[in-house]
């Protein structure tokens, strides 16, 4: 997500080049539709001053800090437990108006012990942009925790009260009578719930002065609320039911508490995004899994009642198992005109991971780009779905209408990256790339 406001007193990256740079590497994404422009910004292994980009980039957040500069935060979904060169990191880059990188540093270095920061959301608290994200790793030492990073101070607040789980994203929703933060759980297939954290203000939510809740259907379902209970064209009413923090001491206890209150079991929730043009509307992806209620995945539309935010209705917007050309949706971003969807196929042999656009005006779904993995990556992964794009955000307020920022996770290739010391070229890890993408009519 992004914020268009200019922020005074922002903590800027310390490591700068004499002149802004863009990567010399080719784009890891290629267009599939007319008019699409793809501009690689930075590639894993690139050096900007004393900063070197790590691999496996994921969630992004960006805002304008002056008439000529843009601040970008970028997750790196890393963990020593996965044989990565460090634990989770967050890069802080300053870009110019062309998208070139002016400077870079690590806001979170990996020494903090978090694992696998996934998608992310940027929201403003009292005029200051905060970067919200969480661990997609419940077996970490923090058992699947989350953080909110203050861009003005460079310090973060750990937010375990948002739930111990496989976090896909942490999404503050604006325009409601109370603060509500959607917490998307990328959990065990068939046991994935949609959570929220409610409070009087977002600042109080950050500091744990609120209530954790899970979505429970109140409409007609069977004894096990699941995607079998809703199809395209139907609406399922529900409410967010309180879960005491004493039941949030571990992912296992939180799961048990969710089952006890009858929470809806999605197959495997991935990203979520709040629609800034429609207060209370949240789109989220259920990526699907083999031998589950949805195989190719769905996109859901959640309509939260702005005046009574604990009430929300669920609809199926897109269904890959029905007539929609979509395979395992993962990350999402939204503008006034379109919803952008990034695939992450469960089986590499099933095809390239694509960038899809759903246009609200005519309800059309179009593939506009795909990843471009190297032949060696395709061979090692067993198919063209070796690489995935991720982290997409609407960048229209930064670069103009139709512009998006996203990244590619280039698995099955190794590049030189900074190790625990942050010294450039001191380790090897998986690749990746940050890109600007222009998509017409979005």
Question: Which residues does each PLM region occupy?
Answer:
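Sequence/structural signature of beta-propeller domains
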Residues: 16-442
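Secretory targeting and sorting signals
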Residues: 1-18
């Amino acid at each position: 997500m992004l914020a268009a406001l200019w922020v005074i007193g922002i903590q800027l990256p310390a490591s700068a080049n004499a002149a802004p740079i863009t990567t010399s590497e080719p784009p890891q994404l290629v267009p599939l539709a007319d008019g699409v422009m793809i501009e690689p910004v930075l590639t894993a292994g690139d050096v900007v001053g004393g900063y070197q980009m790590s691999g496996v980039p994921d969630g992004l957040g960006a805002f304008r800090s002056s008439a000529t500069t843009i601040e970008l935060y970028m997750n790196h979904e890393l963990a020593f437990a996965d044989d990565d060169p460090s634990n989770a990191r967050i890069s802080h880059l300053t870009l110019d108006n062309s998208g070139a990188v002016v400077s870079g540093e690590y806001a979170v270095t990996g020494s903090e012990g978090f694992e696998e920061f996934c998608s992310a959301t940027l929201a403003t608290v009292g005029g200051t942009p905060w970067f919200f994200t969480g661990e997609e790793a419940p077996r970490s030492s923090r058992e699947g925790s989350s953080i909110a990073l203050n861009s003005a101070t460079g310090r973060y607040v750990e937010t375990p009260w948002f739930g111990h789980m496989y976090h896909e994203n942490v999404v503050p929703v604006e325009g409601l009578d109370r603060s509500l933060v959607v917490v998307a759980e990328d959990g065990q297939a068939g046991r994935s719930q949609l959570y929220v954290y409610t409070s009087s203000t977002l600042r109080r939510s950050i500091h744990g002065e609120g209530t954790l809740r899970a979505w429970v259907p109140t409409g007609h379902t069977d004894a096990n609320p699941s995607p079998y209970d809703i199809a395209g064209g139907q609406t399922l009413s529900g409410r967010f039911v309180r879960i005491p923090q004493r039941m949030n001491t571990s992912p296992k206890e939180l799961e048990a508490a969710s089952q006890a209150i009858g929470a809806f079991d999605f197959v495997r929730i991935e990203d979520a995004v709040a629609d800034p043009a429609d207060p209370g509307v949240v789109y989220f992806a259920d990526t699907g899994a083999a031998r589950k209620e949805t195989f190719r995945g769905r996109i859901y539309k959640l309509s939260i009642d702005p005046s009574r935010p604990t009430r929300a209705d669920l609809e199926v917007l897109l269904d890959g198992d029905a007539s929609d050309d979509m395979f395992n949706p993962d990350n999402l971003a939204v503008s006034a005109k379109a919803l952008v969807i990034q695939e992450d196929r469960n089986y590499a042999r099933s095809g390239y991971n694509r960038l899809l656009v759903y246009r609200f005006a005519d309800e059309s779904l179009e593939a506009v780009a795909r990843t471009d993995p190297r032949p060696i990556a395709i061979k090692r992964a067993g198919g063209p779905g070796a690489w995935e794009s991720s982290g997409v955000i609407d960048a229209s307020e930064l670069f103009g209408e139709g512009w998006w920022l996203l990244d590619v996770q280039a698995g099955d290739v190794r590049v030189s990256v900074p190790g625990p010391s942050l010294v450039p070229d001191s380790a090897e890890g998986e690749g990746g790339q940050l890109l600007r993408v222009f998509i017409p009519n979005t």
